[in-house]
Amino acid sequence: MERMGLNEIREEYLKFFESKAHLRLPSFSLVPKNDKSLLLINAGMAPLKPYFTGLQVPPNKRVTTCQKCVRTGDIENVGKTSRHGTFFEMMGNFSFGDYFKEEVIPWAWEFTTEVLKLPKNKLYVTIYEDDDEALDIWVNKTDMDPKRIFRLGKEDNFWEHGLGPCGPCSEIHFDRGAGEVKTSEEFVKASDEDKIVEFWNLVFTQFDKDEEGNYNKLANPNIDTGMGLERMATIMQNVDTIFEVDTIKAVLDKVCKLSGANYKEDRVKDISIRIITDHIRSITFMISDGILPSNEGRGYVLRRLLRRAARHGKTLGINNTFLHNLTDIVIENCYKNYPELEEKREYIKKIIKLEEERFDETIDAGMQILNDYIKEVKNNNYKILSGDKAFKLYDTYGFPVELTEEILEEEGISIDKEGFNKEMKEQRERARSAREETNYMGAEDTILNKIDLNINTDFEGYDKLEVKSKVAVIIKDEEFKNEMEKGNEGVIVTYNTPFYAEMGGQIGDTGIIYNDNFKAEVIDCKKNISGKILHFVKILDGKVALEDQVILKVNEERRNNIRKNHTATHILHAALIKVVGDHVQQSGSYVDDERLRFDFSHFEAVSEDELKEVEKIVNKEIMKANAVNTKVMNIEEAKQQGAIALFDNKYKDDVRVVSVGDFSKELCGGTHVSNSGQIGIFKIVSEAGVAAGIRRIEAVTAFKAMEYVDHKNNILKEAAQILKCNEKELLNKLNHQVLEMKEKEKEIEALKLKLASGAEDEILDNIKEIKGVKVASAAVKDIDGNALRDLGDKIRDNMQSGVVVLGSNYKGKVLFVAMATKDTVAKGVHCGKIIKEVATIAGGGGGGRPDMAQAGGKDPNKLEDAIKTVETVVESLVK
């Protein structure tokens, strides 16, 4: 056995299966496509599900891949052990109804023993206990020693997930110190002790499990294999853990260099070093695939990983931002197989640095709050932190709840998860509502995805808006039908169509389908998971049946407006790169007949001057009346010509390139004008942030742009009429009015202060004494926070000894302040505790120091009730 680098193992594997007539596919994105059962791709076969289920036709019946994967199910163990990690690569070879056991078992043995040259006396094989066929092949088609083959039960060697495709599997294992194993029992024991490790799983998908629990044979069985690249590298490099594998150790060494820590010298530091080493790999690949930090979904997973790694950097004594610098090491070791990493290097680093800086802004304050919570819990001999406090750390300071749990665990404290989940309910409901019912293989369980794969629709809509065709499929009420009549709504599929199906941010076409006997309104047009074009229709007249000859006609005016907006989006993209910077990348878009929306990577608001310049450039390109050309070419040729590709798309070998003069060139399957002059005019309506590092521009074109300008002009005219001036005088008039209002506001505030001073005497006259402590409390009207604090200071100073609690209803908001002299604090008074109890009654919350605290409330009607509780609260605190 010769030592092999991780990258070398990957290449040897893929080359081997290419030699067996497999198509090598690049790794799919970590973001699942058309699979709502997964947040992130977590297995080699996950992106290939549509091929296994028959929903899509594979590009080849034999495929081999090395798939990047992220799993965070056992993230709490990452770092604590040297085995766990969130990022890994899974090598696999797959057969979609082509070869089966008789081919894959000898191939697996050939690769293992002849390419990797693993010693045969170090290898073991397991099979499903009833799989005599697999045993026969291992014994008679390879030179594997039969004594080293063990039959195991369903739990170990049968792959199934609920109902549907399933089957037995055979695994190849490597002896890492077990010595000679003679029985299944000895084998299982050695595996549990990690003395024998599994490195390749061959799954034979040959059954379909039905609802009665029967295993029915599949007509076309499949092969699905998986070999963990990192685990294989530990074997080939004779190291104990993934953190000692060449490419991963390079990252670990950089972490040690940045922190000044030495690996394997301090158990606690080793945990932090491993966490950072693992997490930066996941972080780099996730951002490369277009995922951005957020508080929901996969963006939350990324934020959690990033902030967990940043926090462990601080544990190692790294007090500045550092994670973005580790990205270079990850990319240097991976870019040959993942060229997108190099292409997006600067973008990835900017996103990481931005998130690090945001976390840095809050972590110190958040840690101080958390430390206070820990002290409070311990002082009260509690073992649980309340859910509302954990939620405050999450909501205000950006602490993922898992990070809070991890820190608390070190102190022997847990979180009230029920209380936290209650606080999180709104966010969780939003996330849950976005999910639709799916089956276990990830496809939406709908009749629309069960259309015969042999039925194809040719799209002719680039050049035509009206075509003749035949009806291939009719769907109504979630069933395939032979006909559909007036008043019904459903789906029609034809053999060819001019209707553009919603895709790439462009909305689907509308129009009509008709013949002499019927007429249907097309209200939408989409694609199903296998790419079939679906016309969503309402039958207006007559009846339509399968194989009827029909005419399909697109709403021309609507399509033309969509074209204008789509081409304008391309010009906008190019203008943004020119004005804002070449880091700009599209992260989403939406184009319909009324407006366009463009999301792009940028790290701050686009300035007014920049927006004006962008708008000017776009209109300049429109006025040039540039020809808009489309050309189908090889993907590599398109890239060489500088065509912009979408951030997270995987493209076929041949792509459609849309060019607007020599100003813009993008890969695009949408519909466009033939000349930029047809757009007419372009106006930006808004610019805003939608996520960390992502901005959004909304704009209108043509007549909608004219309507927008007219609307703005009408507002100016109405404003001038209200101020009784002409439009030229409007700005001067407004400035004068604003200055006048500010003077009036100053006068009003001065009057309020006078009133507050008058209230001071009344409050002092009504002081109560509770257990030897003077208490002044009152609700005052229309005083802002500053004035309320000033009033509190005066009353406390006048009292010389005591506590004062004031509340105010200011512009519909409730404000509270509490102050106490030092001697009353010594007697047990704690303003933070008082203010928390009082503010809760008015629907608010807050806290602070023993001698001073402030809070807010939501219900002005409860202000008086809240103030009435002050004396009771003080009484409960005074010793």
Curated annotation (Swiss-Prot):
Reactions catalysed, as given in the entry: tRNA(Ala) + L-alanine + ATP = L-alanyl-tRNA(Ala) + AMP + diphosphate
Keywords: Aminoacyl-tRNA synthetase, ATP-binding, Cytoplasm, Ligase, Metal-binding, Nucleotide-binding, Protein biosynthesis, RNA-binding, tRNA-binding, Zinc
Record's subcellular location: Cytoplasm
Binding site for Zn(2+): H566, H570, C668, H672
InterPro entries in the record: aa-tRNA-synth_II/BPL/LPL, Ala-tRNA-lgiase_IIc, Ala-tRNA-ligase_IIc_anticod-bd, Ala-tRNA-synth_IIc_core, Ala-tRNA-synth_IIc_N, Ala-tRNA_ligase, Ala_tRNA_ligase_euk/bac, DHHA1_dom
Predominant cellular place of this UniProt entry's protein: cytoplasm
Cofactor(s) demanded: Zn(2+)
Main EC class the enzyme belongs to: ligase
UniProt cofactor note: Binds 1 zinc ion per subunit.
Gene Ontology BP, a term: alanyl-tRNA aminoacylation
Keyword Cell membrane: no
PROSITE patterns: AA_TRNA_LIGASE_II_ALA
EC number of the protein: 6.1.1.7
SUPFAM superfamilies the record matches: Class II aaRS and biotin synthetases, Putative anticodon-binding domain of alanyl-tRNA synthetase (AlaRS), ThrRS/AlaRS common domain, Translation proteins
Keyword Transport attributed: no
CDD domains linked: AlaRS_core (cd00673)
Molecular-function annotations in GO: alanine-tRNA ligase activity; aminoacyl-tRNA deacylase activity; ATP binding; catalytic activity, acting on a protein; transferase activity; tRNA binding; zinc ion binding
Gene Ontology CC, one term: cytosol
Family to which the UniProt record says this protein belongs: Belongs to the class-II aminoacyl-tRNA synthetase family.
Functional note: Catalyzes the attachment of alanine to tRNA(Ala) in a two-step reaction: alanine is first activated by ATP to form Ala-AMP and then transferred to the acceptor end of tRNA(Ala). Also edits incorrectly charged Ser-tRNA(Ala) and Gly-tRNA(Ala) via its editing domain.
UniProt note: domains: Consists of three domains; the N-terminal catalytic domain, the editing domain and the C-terminal C-Ala domain. The editing domain removes incorrectly charged amino acids, while the C-Ala domain, along with tRNA(Ala), serves as a bridge to cooperatively bring together the editing and aminoacylation centers thus stimulating deacylation of misacylated tRNAs.
Protein name (record): Alanine--tRNA ligase
Organism: Clostridium botulinum (strain Hall / ATCC 3502 / NCTC 13319 / Type A)
